[in-house]
Amino acid sequence: MQRTTMSYMVATILTLAAVSGISMQSSVQMAHAQLASPACGQVVKGNVTLTANLNCPGDGLIVGGDNTRIDLNGYSITGPGPDSSKVGIVVPNSDLVTVVGPGTVRNFQAGILVTGSDGTNVKRVTFDGNKIAVFMTGTTNTVVEQNLIGPNSIGVAAHSSDMVDVHANLMSSNSLAGVTFVNTDKSTVWANSIGGSANGIFLDSQSDKNSMKFNNVLGNTLDINNADGLALNINDNEFLKNNCNTSNPVGTCVGT
C-alpha cells in the first residue's frame, strides 16, 4: 500500500495510545457503583451479564477489577461514533478479564481498549463501525479469538504489547488494516480470515519475533506487509503457510 496510508495508520495507533489513557481516566471517574444490570459509563467487576442493549453517549463499560467476566448475552453496546474519544469496553490495569459474546460492540473510537493488563480474552464478539475494533497497549497474554470483525478502520491493533494471540477470527472490510502490530513482540496471528483492507497484516519495524501462520489473507491491497518491505531477518518475524497473493517483502505467501 502507499506509504502515506501506512504512515496514517501507524500515526492513528500512536495517537490513540496517547489519548486513550486520558479518556479512560475521565470515564472511570463517572461511576463507581456496580449494578445488577450494567449501564453506560458503569465501572463493573465480577460476573456481569447484559440484559438489554446499551446506547451510550459516552463510554460503555469500564472494568474495575481482576477476574471480571462480561457476557454480552446477545445484546449490543453502541457508541456515539468512531470519531469520538469514547470506548465500548475499557480494561485498565485489570488481569484475567473475559469479554464474551454473542453480542456486538459498535460505533466507538475503540470497541475494546485493553491497557496495562494481563490475560484478557475477547471471544465471539461482533465489532463494526469502530475506528479500531480491539486495541491493546502495554498488555501481555491478550487472546482475541473467534470474533467477527468488520467493517472498522482497523480490526485488531497491538501497541507495545507482548504475547498477543489472535486466532480464528473473521475480519472483513477493515479499511486500513485487519491486524496491525506496533512495537509488539513474541505474538502469534494464526488461522484467521482477513480481507478487504489496505493491509491484511501489518507489522512495523519495531515488532519482532512474531509468528504469522496458517492465515487466509486475500483480497487486500497488500495482504502481508512486514514493515514496508523490511527483510525478515532484521526483525525475526515468522511467516508460515499463509494463503495470500501479495506481500512486502515478497516470499511470505504460500507458493511465492
Predicted regions and their residues:
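Extracellular beta-strand-rich solenoid/capping regions of secreted or surface-exposed proteins
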Residues: V43, N55-I70, G79-T98, R106-D118, ...
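Eukaryotic tandem repeat interaction scaffolds
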Residues: I154-W190
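N-terminal domain-start segments of secreted/luminal proteins
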Residues: A31-L61
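Leucine-rich solenoid repeat scaffolds
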Residues: K209-T256
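Secretory targeting signatures
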Residues: M1-Q34, L50, I70, V122, ...
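Consensus "Asn ladder" position of solenoid repeat domains
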Residues: P102-G103, V125, N130, N147, ...
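Structural detector of coil-to-beta-strand junctions
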Residues: G60-I62, K86-V90, G111-L113, K131-V134, ...
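Small-residue (G/S/T/A) turn/hinge positions that recur once per unit in extracellular repeat modules
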Residues: G65-T68, Y75, S94-D95, S117, ...
